[in-house]
From Swiss-Prot:
Ligase listed as a keyword: yes
Root EC class: ligase
Record's comment describing the protein's domains: Consists of three domains: the N-terminal catalytic domain, the editing domain and the C-terminal anticodon-binding domain.
Protein name in UniProt: Proline--tRNA ligase
Natural source organism: Baumannia cicadellinicola subsp. Homalodisca coagulata
Localization: Cytoplasm
Gene Ontology MF annotations: aminoacyl-tRNA deacylase activity; ATP binding; proline-tRNA ligase activity
Parts forming coiled coils: none
Similarity annotation: Belongs to the class-II aminoacyl-tRNA synthetase family. ProS type 1 subfamily.
Transmembrane portions of the chain: none
A single BP term in Gene Ontology: prolyl-tRNA aminoacylation
GO cellular component terms listed in the entry, alphabetical order: cytosol
Swiss-Prot/TrEMBL keywords: Aminoacyl-tRNA synthetase, ATP-binding, Cytoplasm, Ligase, Nucleotide-binding, Protein biosynthesis
Function: Catalyzes the attachment of proline to tRNA(Pro) in a two-step reaction: proline is first activated by ATP to form Pro-AMP and then transferred to the acceptor end of tRNA(Pro). As ProRS can inadvertently accommodate and process non-cognate amino acids such as alanine and cysteine, to avoid such errors it has two additional distinct editing activities against alanine. One activity is designated as 'pretransfer' editing and involves the tRNA(Pro)-independent hydrolysis of activated Ala-AMP.
Amino acid sequence: MRTSQYLLSTIKEIPLDAEVISHQLMLRAGIIRQLASGLYTWLPTGLRILRKVENIVREEMNNIGAIEVSMPIVQPANLWLESGRWGQYGPELLRFTDRSTRQFLLGPTHEEVITDLIRNEVKSYKQLPLNLFQIKTKFRDEVRPRYGVMRSREFIMKDAYSFHTSQQSLQATYDLMYYTYNTIFNRIGLDVRTVQADPGSIGGHLSHEFLALVSNYEDQMLLIDASHKATERNLPSENLQLVDAPGIYTLTELVKLFNLPIEKIAQIIIVHAQQNALYPLVALMVRGDHSINYAQVEKLPQVASPLVFATEDEIRLAIGVGSSSLGPINLPLPLIIDHSVAVMSDFVAGANIDGKYFFGINWERDLSLPEVANLTNQNISVSQPQRLHRTNWIEVGHIFQLGSKYSKVMKATVQGEDGNNMIMTMGCYGIGITRVVAAAIDKYNDKQGLLLPVSIAPFQVAIIPINLHKSLLVQTVAEQLYNQLSIRKIDVLLDDRKERPGVMFADIELIGIPHIIIIGDRNLAVQKIEYKNRSNGEKKLMNLSIIVDWIVAKLNS
């Protein structure tokens, strides 16, 4: 791409109505322009970033076998009346009537539409499980749009919906989506925390939010750093792995099979909750070599007194697996952990799938630290039980186990293995694409402008030719490098404007192109060009003959 043929709409001044850094930079760098309150046009530079985020999401969805579809943003009211959400949603649902006086809405979500589609297209259990996704514009009539695209009325979202014949099948897909989301956010370069959340208006019985840390936003959370006088929690040294261990029913068998120290295993005990509690059962987690202290546990306000342990049947009914495979990740019950568990790292626990275990679990990386209490007979001395710090965050992803919330009321059934009709079990999984862009810009910037990772930068390489329109040599070399990089499928922007070098540098650095090639007569006289790394400011002279191969190798690495 050449700047002479491109809409590079940069501005110098910081817009007065932009409250947060991401909104300021998105306006200054020519990424978005406001059309009306909460409505934005995406300019070419912004659209390039947006498409790269979409492509990362699409690639990872394809990698796990999800199938892409496209559903209308305009939805008939009758589907929402059928599900019951027409009356539950407030004024944020934009409703309208067509010329035939039929009621419609602009969809903020697509649970009803996808459920209607699948109940008409899928007839047998043999066609399940199924995971469908789309990347689509949504609309929510926010009462007070703010912070640019962080809280706008129109937004782009990746939403996926899975259909199953059992809770165990749903749990397997839920776990897969959970880790796929972490892969997506890692590729984009976001610092994301995962917390168990209220399903809200979407519904269901279990959900997790993916929260990106940002510099300034109205939503806040407390992060807990737990430390232990005798055993400081170590930094993660292992990757999270899902390991098969069929036929294992006790800690002793698990220790023998994998030659594990028992203190590296965390076990979960399920007990009855207080009467009238939201959940009938509560999960307690202790180290493998520790036992719970009945008197201590009975003091907990969530737990029934006297203490009653859940039966194997109660556990399987509530969670879908036996007690030997219980673990903290995606556990659909309130969880309280012992102080000794709070300082564990790279530990082992069940995966909430029969015969499967997670190895290398770490708090805050793989799941948020839940409530911590003294559950055991151990006399633990904690020097700093809780170090709290408040941070700003924005939700960039949310996954839900919907169960039969929509399929039951909308009669979405398939013929089961026994020949009888059965209600499908559902999950749904969302990523806010436009919010992800804003969160990434919030994280990656400096006083010059954007510092986006190569994976989502609008261009990979910029060529700045000094005195392009006065030097035939500079013009020739600039064209050669531009063509060579383009042939190698590198996203390159050639700044061929009749502008001063200072203006070109300011614009290229503002929009955040990570690799910059500077061409000038003085360096060309000795067959050299200058290279600048946008992220760390590194500059060096390089041989003209190797620059293309060197850039390509750097990008591929």
